Regions:
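Positively charged, small/polar-rich N-terminal and surface patches that mediate targeting and assembly
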Residues: 1-125
Length: 125
């Protein structure tokens, strides 16, 4: 297995769709040149209960969310997480979850570049 020289981490952010725009508009501050965003259905420990509901749900109710996936150098993760937490925080149920996992390597298939080279802006030729 090929391993990247620089340690990389994957940050997966699950949140409301309305909060994703702020994340994407400001990601470049952290040198992020790419991300993956997809729609998801899910719920947390509240089982999909909304704050305006008087009683907690007894069964799972899946809510519409978006997942933002970013890979960046591990040394930059703490600053990025501070930004993400401040961007998402409302203090209400459903602000989201963040998962951080190590990434062994990243490979740009077209060029064979690996590690951070695979994540940086490349040439178009």
């Amino acid at each position: 297995m090929r391993v990247a020289i620089e340690e990389l981490s994957k940050v997966e952010i699950i949140t409301r769709e309305a909060k994703v725009t702020e994340l994407t508009e400001n990601a470049s501050r952290f040198g992020i040149t790419g991300m993956t965003i997809y729609n998801a259905l899910g719920c947390g420990v509240q089982l999909g209960t909304q704050e305006y509901e008087a009683e907690k749900n007894d069964s799972l109710r899946l809510l519409s969310k978006q997942v933002v996936m970013v890979v960046l150098p591990t040394r930059e993760v703490d600053d990025f997480l501070d930004f993400v937490e401040k961007s998402l925080y409302t203090g209400h149920i459903g602000d989201g979850k963040i998962f951080v996992t190590p990434v062994t390597n990243a490979i740009r298939v077209r060029t064979g570049e690996e590690g951070m080279d695979a994540l940086k802006e490349g040439t178009l030729d």
